[in-house]
């Protein structure tokens, strides 16, 4: 899977991932959008990520 992995509004960059999904999430403590490989369960009051299963789907 190819996922975007840039922070916030930086120019898009990608990485090739072992996982079959990508995620995008806004972290509550700094309001920065993070992107990357896989999908995860948030801790505490952090909102859940947007997860998707196609190449470059997490822009």
Curated annotation (Swiss-Prot):
Disulfide bonds join 3-22, 17-37, 39-51, 52-57. The keyword Disulfide bond applies. Expressed by the venom gland. InterPro entries: Snake_3FTx, Snake_toxin-like_sf. It is found in: Secreted. Keywords: Cell adhesion impairing toxin, Disulfide bond, Hemostasis impairing toxin, Platelet aggregation inhibiting toxin, Secreted, Toxin. One of its GO terms (molecular function) is toxin activity. Changing residue 43 to Q: This mutation alters integrin binding selectivity. Inhibits ADP-induced platelet aggregation and inhibits the binding of purified platelet fibrinogen receptor alpha-IIb/beta-3 (ITGA2B/ITGB3) to immobilized fibrinogen. Has also been described to inhibit cell adhesion to fibrinogen, fibronectin, laminin and collagen. Belongs to the three-finger toxin family. Short-chain subfamily. Antiplatelet toxin sub-subfamily. This is Dendroaspin. The lineage of its organism: Eukaryota, Metazoa, Chordata, Craniata, Vertebrata.
């Amino acid at each position: 899977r190819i996922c975007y992995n840039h922070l916030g509004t930086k120019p898009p960059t990608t990485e090739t991932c072992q996982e079959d999904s990508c995620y995008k999430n806004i972290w509550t403590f700094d309001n920065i959008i993070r992107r990357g490989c896989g999908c995860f369960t948030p801790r505490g009051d952090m909102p859940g990520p947007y997860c998707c299963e196609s190449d470059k789907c997490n822009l």
